Amino acid sequence: VGSEMCIRDRDKGELCVVNAKETDVQGVKSYPSVHDIPETELAIISIPSKSCPEVMEVLARQKGVKAFIVISAGLGEETHEGGILEQQMLDVVNEAGASLIGPNCIGLMNMNYHGVFTQPIPEFHPDGVDFISSSGGTALFIIESALTKGLRFSSVWSVGNSKQNGVEDILEYMDRNFDPVLDSKIKMLYIEQIKQPDKLLYHASSLIRKGCKIAAIKAGSTESGKRAASSHTGAIASSDSAVEALFRKAGIVRCFSREELTTVASIFTLKDVKGKNC
């Protein structure tokens, strides 16, 4: 699915495929190694996790890559050795002055790019919802729920283990680059671990002051939620009362299930009721 969607979007830029066993992937030339590709801006990596640091180093140092989406899993969420590999990946990215989404994620989608390796692929529209999720798998369940309610999306971000960029960082990006005319004013969040509560509070509050509405789930308030969170980040659930206080202070509408989250987002799409009888 991911290759097909990248190929469909290739009119927006040149696409390089690396596959040691193939010379052609769905009509696109395939290179045997990352050493053979031309310089490129973005690398989407889905290979055995033990090979990630070495491949990323070649891409960063020799091919000028400044953005990485790492889909590969089996890293810090599973073992200590996996955590060491993650740190090596981060060191490569930071040394190159690059950006990293992941690992252990499905990546991102927006109106110009749909290169994820899974389904469903929702409809994208400028007036759709911006959705940031710690978990790729849970993001898909939430998207499925949203589709039954007719929700469209402006962007979808899956940050996985959040080695460099987490939910708070994506929210900061949206806040600092917010365009009141062009950008969506509805945000949905699925958060497994709040690593930077001050950043979350500041940028959520700022977006809300700019006219946005934010609904969020904080995983870990139930036993099943705790298991879901630990499967992606190894995170220990935050104090529920602290989460409640943070969300209230920021102005975030707290939800406790995917159905509640997508229902609240659907309500956000409705026009405000005005008039003397309101």
Regions flagged by a language model, labelled:
Residues 3-4, 8-278:
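Catalytic-core regions of core metabolic enzymes
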